[in-house]
């Protein structure tokens, strides 16, 4: 039951799940017809640091590597189509490509950071993928999944 959708999340009366609280979940004390829209820095921090979202980003990063193509450019384009349903703009590709190279160099040099990122969550990191590459793509997936365009419905 770990990977069920949020609609099946157990709600406690006295203690609301922190992720739901950050995203303005209504209290159970009264009926709510329409939820307010908000976009706060706290929500961005939850999406970047909550183990649930870090694990989701790592799983998506593994898909980027396996299904996205052979080159980083193909993988970035694939990820944008999957998450945002649109093509990646050239400036976005350039920006994310340079960020990917920076993170790849960092994770190749720092084994402790790479290993700690691979242990977040309940799902084990795939053993058949390069750990540094997976960690770097996880960082990119976290950026893409935290875009305003991704989390805010228009």
Residue ranges of predicted features:
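An acidic, gly/pro-interrupted, aromatic-rich
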Residues: 1-74, 123-154
